[in-house]
C-alpha cells in the first residue's frame, strides 16, 4: 500500500467514526431492540480492522496502546461476574436487576445489569476478533 494514500486515510477517519458511533448505538439498543453486545462488538472490531488496513498496524497500536488479549480477558471476566454475583445473594444464575437513577444532565435513567453483561460481551468480542486478525496478519497480537 502506498504511504501517501490521502483519500483512503481521510475516508477511513470518517468511516471509523461512523462505525464506532453505530456500534455504540447497537450496544445500547440491544436489550430492547435488535443489536446487543455481540453485534456491537463486531462493528467496533471492524472499525479497528479498517484502521489497521488504512494505516500501518504498528502506527495504530502506538496511537491506541490497547492490549487486545487483556481486553478479551477483562470482557469475559466482567460477563462472568455479572452472571455469578447474584448467586451470592440467593438469586439464580444470570439474574437481572434494574433500577431507575436520577442523573444531573440526563434526568431519570433506566439502568440494568444486562447492560453491564453486554459491555463484557463487547470487550470480549473486540478482543477476540482483533487478536485473531492480528495473529493471522502477522502483526503484534
Curated annotation (Swiss-Prot):
Q: Name one GO cellular component term.
A: plasma membrane
Membrane-related topology note: Multi-pass membrane protein
Tell me one GO biological process term.
monoatomic ion transport
* Main location group: membrane
For this UniProt entry, which segments traverse the membrane?
10-30, 35-55, 70-90, 116-136
Q: Name one Pfam family in it.
A: MnhB
| Gene Ontology terms for molecular function | antiporter activity
Q: Which UniProt keywords apply?
A: Antiport, Cell membrane, Ion transport, Membrane, Transmembrane, Transmembrane helix, Transport
Assembly, per entry: May form a heterooligomeric complex that consists of seven subunits: mnhA2, mnhB2, mnhC2, mnhD2, mnhE2, mnhF2 and mnhG2.
What's this protein's family per the entry? Belongs to the CPA3 antiporters (TC 2.A.63) subunit B family.
Task: Name the PANTHER family for this protein.
Answer: NA(+)/H(+) ANTIPORTER SUBUNIT B, NA(+)_H(+) ANTIPORTER SUBUNIT B
Q: Could you identify this protein by its name?
A: Putative antiporter subunit mnhB2
- From what organism does this protein derive? Staphylococcus saprophyticus subsp. saprophyticus (strain ATCC 15305 / DSM 20229 / NCIMB 8711 / NCTC 7292 / S-41)
Q: What is the lineage of its organism?
A: Bacteria, Bacillati, Bacillota, Bacilli, Bacillales
The gene it comes from is mnhB2
Amino acid at each position: 500500500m502506498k504511504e501517501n494514500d490521502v483519500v483512503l486515510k481521510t475516508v477511513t477517519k470518517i468511516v471509523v467514526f461512523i462505525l464506532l458511533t453505530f456500534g455504540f448505538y447497537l450496544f445500547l439498543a440491544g436489550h430492547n431492540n435488535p443489536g446487543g453486545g455481540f453485534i456491537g462488538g463486531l462493528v467496533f472490531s471492524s472499525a479497528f480492522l479498517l484502521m489497521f488496513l488504512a494505516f500501518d498496524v504498528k502506527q495504530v497500536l502506538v496511537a491506541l496502546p490497547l492490549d487486545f488479549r487483556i481486553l478479551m480477558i477483562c470482557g469475559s471476566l466482567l460477563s462472568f461476574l455479572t452472571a455469578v454475583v447474584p448467586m451470592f445473594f440467593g438469586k439464580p444464575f444470570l439474574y437481572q436487576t434494574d433500577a431507575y437513577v436520577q442523573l444531573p444532565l440526563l434526568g431519570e435513567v433506566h439502568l440494568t445489569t444486562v447492560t453491564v453483561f453486554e459491555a463484557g460481551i463487547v470487550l470480549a468480542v473486540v478482543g477476540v476478533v482483533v487478536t485473531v486478525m492480528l495473529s493471522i496478519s502477522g502483526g503484534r497480537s
